From Swiss-Prot:
Domain Toprim: 81-175
Residues making up the signal peptide according to the UniProt record: none
Keywords, comma-separated and alphabetical: DNA damage, DNA recombination, DNA repair, Metal-binding, Zinc, Zinc-finger
Protein name (Swiss-Prot/TrEMBL): Recombination protein RecR
InterPro entries per record: DNA_Rcmb_RecR, Rcmb_RecR, Rcmb_RecR_Znf, TOPRIM_dom, TOPRIM_RecR
Originating organism: Clostridium botulinum (strain Hall / ATCC 3502 / NCTC 13319 / Type A)
Presence of the UniProt keyword DNA repair in the record: yes
Record family assignment: Belongs to the RecR family.
Length: 198
């Protein structure tokens, strides 16, 4: 748009690249940031650069971390015989909020979606298989309750069953078509409690 200076338009474009942010919201965020004191803008930009520079994926589970392995994988009080498989790192935050699960996680970084051109080789399934050893008794599949999540869950069940590990799926207290990120703690706790074997 010609009525904004190039620097403002560029900032709007960058905000609009974020998921769920359209042009109008990006415009509001840009104008908000421009009205902040310079020191706050500097702190924000430094925090962004520092997070991007120091945060990496845990070599064990695939969660975001600044230390490898992450705090969950390195915690001796976590039950390492149970692995909860989730689609994205943000889903760990949702599961941890319920304070009902004491196992470890495996982040797939996606799901199987033929419509989007994502197959089993595009998510972290080989890494999951490598983690299945004699010490793992159960794999809880907590993928989102949508078509892609169900396809992913069934595929995981198919590849893990021959390894002799119990594979369960969280119960559908979580609304079909919804994301774990938006489920409340009680719903997630009930879904975890009512998981079923696949």
């Amino acid at each position: 748009m010609d009525f904004y200076p190039i620097a403002i338009e560029k900032l709007i474009e960058e905000f609009a690249k974020l998921p769920g942010i359209g042009y109008k919201t990006a415009q509001r965020l840009t104008l908000y940031v421009l009205n902040l004191p310079k020191e706050e803008v500097k702190e924000f930009s430094e925090a962004l650069v520092k997070a991007r520079g120091t945060i990496k994926y845990c070599s064990v589970c695939g969660n975001f971390t600044d230390k490898d392995p992450c705090a969950i994988c390195s915690n001796p009080n976590r039950n390492k015989s149970i692995i909860c498989v989730i689609e994205q790192p943000k889903d760990i935050m949702s599961m941890e909020k319920i304070r009902e699960y004491n196992g470890v996680y495996h982040v797939l970084h996606g799901n199987i979606s033929p419509m989007a051109g994502r197959g089993p080789e595009d998510i972290k399934l080989k890494e999951l298989i490598r983690r299945i050893d004699g010490s793992v008794n159960e794999v809880i599949v907590a993928t989102n309750p949508n078509v892609e999540g169900e396809a992913t869950a069934m595929y995981i069940s198919k590849i893990l069953k021959p390894l002799g590990v119990k594979v369960t799926r969280i119960a559908h207290g979580v609304p079909v078509g919804g994301d774990l990120e938006y489920a409340d703690e009680v719903t997630l706790a009930k879904a975890l409690e009512g998981r079923i074997e696949l």
